[in-house]
């Protein structure tokens, strides 16, 4: 299958592109800028473009059998001093369905959107969060295009565990250093609450399953392990060799401020994915502990001082 992975230089997109390539698909990554030399997808073909500015053309997409959309922006990507309503419109609520419509008009037959779980699990969160509402609109807007000629579906995953060299490794560098016990000025607690977590490898497997067997118009709530934030922090500490216990406090934390907890500090978003959907998509469960250990290894390797 000839597949275009939009957002293919990001953490989720890069893992997905490599997974699809390794299983035999002909993969191209779409990116706004140049691909770094140390990127996991540096050896893959690149299509330059920006879906938020509608720079892709029908001719760009015509060669592809399928598109994986893994470029969705979240609260970490919201720039300062921007019109938030306009940002989410371009990045999510209008931008994603418009890109899906372009893919459909180009003759692409399969489209898998990597979305987010908030609106799927707790629809009422869209009433209080512009981000969640935008994710919902992007999900529903793209799936509304489904018909006999265009199999479009959405995967709605939880918090994803993974890293690649570059921005994501740098984002986790200080957190891994703290987990190892090297940042005494950062408190050893986690905020109250928790959520579901999933490895990026499991998500990539689910994308592959959705490309092969996803139902037109379907939205799949995917996930793996329900963890408190303290349990997730503890996995990081254990993987980094920090040799201490992380307590739960009803206080914000530098690595998980209240702005990052969409459901609100102290609340838990826990669920079990539907077993039939898990089997259909064919992704691995029980992979979070391994993924945290891998994250620590990747971050350390990518951020180590040059010899």
Regions found by a protein language model. Name each.
Residues 162-175, 210-220:
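Glycine/proline-rich active-site loop of Rossmann-fold NAD(P)-dependent oxidoreductases
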Residues 44-94, 120-122:
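NAD(P)H-binding glycine-rich loop region in Rossmannoid oxidoreductase-like domains
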Residues 175-198:
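A conserved pocket-lining segment of Rossmann-fold NAD(P)-dependent short-chain dehydrogenase/reductase
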Residues 115, 142-167:
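Conserved beta-loop-beta element that borders a ligand/cofactor-binding pocket
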């Amino acid at each position: 299958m000839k597949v275009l992975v939009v957002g293919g230089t990001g953490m989720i997109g890069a893992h997905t592109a490599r997974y699809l390539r390794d299983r035999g698909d002909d993969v191209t990554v779409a990116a706004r800028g140049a691909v770094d030399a140390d990127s996991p997808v540096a050896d893959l073909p690149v299509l330059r473009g920006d879906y938020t500015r509608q720079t892709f053309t029908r001719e760009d997409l015509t060669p592809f059998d399928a598109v994986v959309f893994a470029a969705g922006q979240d609260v970490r990507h919201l720039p300062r001093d921007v019109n938030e309503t306009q940002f989410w419109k371009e990045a999510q609520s209008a931008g994603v369905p418009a890109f899906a419509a372009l893919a459909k008009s180009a003759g692409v037959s399969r489209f898998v959107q990597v979305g987010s779980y908030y609106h799927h699990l707790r629809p009422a969160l869209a009433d209080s969060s512009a981000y969640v509402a935008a994710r919902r609109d992007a999900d529903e807007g793209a799936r509304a295009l489904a018909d006999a000629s265009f199999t479009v579906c959405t995967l709605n995953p939880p918090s994803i565990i993974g890293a690649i060299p570059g921005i994501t490794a740098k984002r986790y560098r200080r957190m891994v250093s703290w987990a190892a016990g090297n940042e005494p000025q950062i408190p050893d607690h986690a905020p109250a609450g928790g959520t579901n977590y999933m490895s990026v490898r499991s998500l990539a497997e689910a994308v592959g399953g959705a490309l092969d067997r996803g139902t037109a118009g379907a939205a799949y709530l995917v996930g793996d392990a329900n963890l408190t934030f303290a349990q997730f922090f503890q996995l990081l500490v254990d993987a980094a060799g920090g040799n201490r216990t992380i307590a739960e406090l009803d206080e914000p934390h530098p690595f998980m401020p209240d702005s990052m907890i969409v459901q609100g500090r102290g609340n838990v978003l826990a669920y079990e994915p539907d077993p039939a959907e898990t089997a259909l998509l064919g992704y691995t469960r029980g992979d979070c502990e391994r993924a945290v250990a891998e994250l620590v290894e990747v971050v350390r390797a990518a951020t180590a001082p040059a010899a």
